[in-house]
Curated annotation (Swiss-Prot):
Gene Ontology terms, MF aspect: NAD+ poly-ADP-ribosyltransferase activity; NAD+-protein-arginine ADP-ribosyltransferase activity; nucleotidyltransferase activity
Keyword Transmembrane helix: no
Gene3D superfamilies named among the record's database cross-references: Toxin ADP-ribosyltransferase, Chain A, domain 1
Organism: Homo sapiens
Protein name per Swiss-Prot or TrEMBL: Ecto-ADP-ribosyltransferase 4
Glycosylated residues, chain numbering: 114, 178, 222, 257, 274
Propeptide boundaries: 286-314
Family the entry assigns: Belongs to the Arg-specific ADP-ribosyltransferase family.
GO BP term, example: arginine metabolic process
Length: 314
């Protein structure tokens, strides 16, 4: 399947995909939990759903995989001093980055192949700070939709690149060492309920920190539990000291099982490919050249956009 969007020619592909999109906001939520769903049934007039639906806006989740431009982006991040620009734009981030850096140095470990200290610190910076997680996810959902907006308003260029690169490098390292391609992990969200159906395709449009521990998915109580079979996520316990797998925002999943209960729901998801809207956005922001968008590996009936604000935890 070719790219869903060819920005150079401004043509939508394929033409059989209906332009239906919607944004859903859970009432009373605080922390953004971005999901992109395809195949989700639209609510009917009689359905009782505690959400607000807006059919006017696309989500714009920033999901760059840096396909074919990883080295160039790394060089530009350094040359443009984007680390300083990003850190100075966020309150207390420099202190938190220093703390994450010190935590890595104190572990005294050897870096995995092809990884740098910055990769390790980026993982700790993200996984150890809930404020960073919240701010980062919110920014990915709203302020990187065009190259110009990305350059001007997205102050997580450095973190996004190094988290994405770290996941990709760790996957290669894991495959070379033990041949492990996929992981069964668990994730739960508090005070959130989802309505999907078996066979629907779902995408978490954010970096999702999940647990390898099965007991994490056994505590019911007004929450949604996910059992996820990820094939693009990477284990980060070597850095965070927790049995975690970090799932990238561009991985697609199919809902293969589910159950609903008054005090807790459960969904079982299986990896089914990847989907990115953006590619090499940093280079596009500083160049007039047309850089190809990424190829989407997926079969979608239509793409429905959903943004959910909630409290979530592993």
């Amino acid at each position: 399947m070719g790219p869903l969007i060819n920005r150079c020619k401004k043509i939508l592909l394929p033409t059989t995909v209906p332009p239906a999109t919607m944004r859903i906001w859970l009432l009373g939520g605080l922390l953004p939990f971005l999901l992109l769903l395809s195949g989700l049934q639209r609510p009917t007039e009689g359905s009782e759903v505690a959400i607000k639906i807006d059919f006017d806006f696309a989500p714009g989740s920033f999901d760059d995989q840096y396909q074919g431009c990883s080295k160039q982006v790394m060089e530009k991040l350094t040359q443009g001093d984007y680390f300083t620009k990003d850190i100075e734009a966020q309150k207390n981030y420099f202190r938190m980055w220093q703390k994450a850096h010190l935590a890595w140095l104190n572990q005294g470990k050897v870096l995995p192949q092809n990884m740098t200290t910055t990769h390790a610190v980026a993982i700790l910076f993200y996984t150890l700070n809930s404020n960073v997680h919240s701010d980062f996810t919110r920014a990915m959902a709203s302020v990187a939709r065009t190259p110009q907006q990305y350059e001007r308003s997205f102050h997580f260029k450095y973190l996004h690149y190094y988290l994405t690169s770290a996941i990709q490098l760790l996957r290669k390292d894991s495959i070379m060492e033990n041949g492990t391609l996929c992981y069964e992990v668990h994730y739960r969200t508090k005070d959130v309920h989802f309505n999907a159906y078996t066979g629907a395709t779902i995408r978490f449009g954010q970096f999702l920190s999940t647990s390898l521990l099965k007991e994490e998915a056994q505590e019911f109580g007004n929450q949604t539990l996910f059992t996820i079979f990820t094939c693009l996520g990477a284990p980060v316990q070597y850095f965070s000291l927790k049995k975690e797998v970090l799932i990238p925002p561009y991985e697609l999943f199919k809902v293969i099982n589910m159950s609903y209960h008054p005090r807790g729901d459960w969904l079982q998801l299986r990896s089914t490919g990847n989907l990115s809207t953006y590619n090499c956005q940093l280079l596009k922001a500083s160049s007039k050249k047309c850089i190809p968008d990424p190829i989407a590996i997926a079969s979608l009936s239509f793409l429905t956009s959903v943004i959910i604000f909630s409290k979530s935890r592993v």
